A protein has these predicted regions:
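The feature marks the mature, well-folded catalytic cores of soluble enzymes
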Residues: 1-115
Length: 115
């Protein structure tokens, strides 16, 4: 009801059919505008119809958990194909060391305080 009163909508995405995703941000990030970065697990989901979905390259799923802030895209280092793809799309890609956080399934969105 609150969402509707403030002219927002919501969509349920059932992650039980996607066992490799710990939570939605594990496989999906907003890149600004109507563009999303997604893993193959979720890239074709019907809830994403109407969005431009950029799929992370094979074997680089962890890179899908990124943060777009102040015209820079913070990404985990060590995923060169994803970084190159995002750079080609015009993003200022800033790779960050995440290897220790990754050991405990932590990602960039886990470390951020969002507004």
């Amino acid at each position: 009801d609150w969402l509707r009163r403030h002219r927002f909508t919501s969509t349920v995405i059932d992650l039980r059919a996607m066992p490799r995703l710990l939570h939605l941000k594990t496989g999906l990030s907003w890149l600004g505008g109507r563009r999303l970065l997604a893993t193959g697990d979720i890239a074709g989901h019907e809830a994403l119809n109407g969005w431009e979905v950029v799929q992370v390259p094979e074997g680089e799923d962890y890179a899908a958990n990124c943060i777009w802030v102040n015209d820079a895209l913070l990404v985990a280092e060590g995923f060169p194909a994803t970084s190159a793809l995002l750079g080609e799309l015009g993003y200022d890609v800033v790779p960050l060391a995440m290897s220790e956080f990754r050991k405990m399934d932590g990602g960039l969105s886990c470390l951020s305080v969002r507004w």
